[in-house]
Amino acid sequence: MSDTSETICSMCQLFYVNKWVLGTGGGIGIKQDNIAYISPSGIEKELLEPEQIVKYNIQDDTYQCGAPGLKPSACTPLFLELFKTLGASCVIHTHSINAVLCSMIYEKEFTIKDIEQIKAIPKGDGTNLRNVDTLRIPIIDNAPEEQDLMPALKQMIKDYPNACAVLVKRHGLFVWGPTPKKAKIYIESIDYLFEVALKMKELGQ
């Protein structure tokens, strides 16, 4: 049992309490050297145990499951692409209500500015955005299977090389960062900003 596996379980339990990963939805992947630790498919996140975490060997595309019948999250190809292309060490995928609603209300980008919490989001040059900057999160169309999102994800990476998140329309949110701690900070801040934006629209702001 590794600290990384325990980290994934702890985050899954927290995100379940937040109602971001209900009904087996969502997933988390953490990369350490050539091994990606990935939450398994079909397991309720609040019940996930460290020994159930899938260990995926990035070099030879093989994986080991801690229990019979388990397989990696359907998000695995997307996680691996973000690890490889952007150098991320942690990717979090959630199905939060705020994320789904924002993906439906906004067209190609979610944007927000002049909110203090924006300061928690990286700018892409080693610094963070300022509260007066505009946060832009791209939105891509959903697909029948997670792996079918790959072409849109690759195009998003080209169009938004400094992004740390992408919304999938009527589906959810992917967030990534250089460490699990950073990725957790980003996704908590972004979901908070989604909620602020939704309430602002309710108030006609």
Swiss-Prot record:
<comment type="similarity">
    <text>Belongs to the aldolase class II family. MtnB subfamily.</text>
</comment>
<dbReference type="Pfam" id="PF00596">
    <property type="entry name" value="Aldolase_II"/>
</dbReference>
<keyword id="KW-0456">Lyase</keyword>
<keyword id="KW-0479">Metal-binding</keyword>
<dbReference type="GO" id="GO:0005737">
    <property type="term" value="C:cytoplasm"/>
</dbReference>
<feature type="binding site">
    <location>
        <position position="95"/>
    </location>
    <ligand>
        <name>Zn(2+)</name>
    </ligand>
</feature>
<feature type="binding site">
    <location>
        <position position="75"/>
    </location>
    <ligand>
        <name>substrate</name>
    </ligand>
</feature>
<dbReference type="GO" id="GO:0019509">
    <property type="term" value="P:L-methionine salvage from methylthioadenosine"/>
</dbReference>
<keyword id="KW-0486">Methionine biosynthesis</keyword>
<keyword id="KW-0028">Amino-acid biosynthesis</keyword>
<comment type="pathway">
    <text>Amino-acid biosynthesis; L-methionine biosynthesis via salvage pathway; L-methionine from S-methyl-5-thio-alpha-D-ribose 1-phosphate: step 2/6.</text>
</comment>
<feature type="binding site">
    <location>
        <position position="171"/>
    </location>
    <ligand>
        <name>Zn(2+)</name>
    </ligand>
</feature>
<feature type="binding site">
    <location>
        <position position="93"/>
    </location>
    <ligand>
        <name>Zn(2+)</name>
    </ligand>
</feature>
<keyword id="KW-0862">Zinc</keyword>
<protein>
    <recommendedName>
        <fullName>Methylthioribulose-1-phosphate dehydratase</fullName>
        <ecNumber>4.2.1.109</ecNumber>
    </recommendedName>
</protein>
<comment type="function">
    <text>Catalyzes the dehydration of methylthioribulose-1-phosphate (MTRu-1-P) into 2,3-diketo-5-methylthiopentyl-1-phosphate (DK-MTP-1-P).</text>
</comment>
<dbReference type="InterPro" id="IPR017714">
    <property type="entry name" value="MethylthioRu-1-P_deHdtase_MtnB"/>
</dbReference>
<dbReference type="InterPro" id="IPR001303">
    <property type="entry name" value="Aldolase_II/adducin_N"/>
</dbReference>
<dbReference type="GO" id="GO:0046570">
    <property type="term" value="F:methylthioribulose 1-phosphate dehydratase activity"/>
</dbReference>
<feature type="active site" description="Proton donor/acceptor">
    <location>
        <position position="116"/>
    </location>
</feature>
<keyword id="KW-0963">Cytoplasm</keyword>
<dbReference type="GO" id="GO:0008270">
    <property type="term" value="F:zinc ion binding"/>
</dbReference>
<dbReference type="InterPro" id="IPR027514">
    <property type="entry name" value="Salvage_MtnB_euk"/>
</dbReference>
<dbReference type="InterPro" id="IPR036409">
    <property type="entry name" value="Aldolase_II/adducin_N_sf"/>
</dbReference>
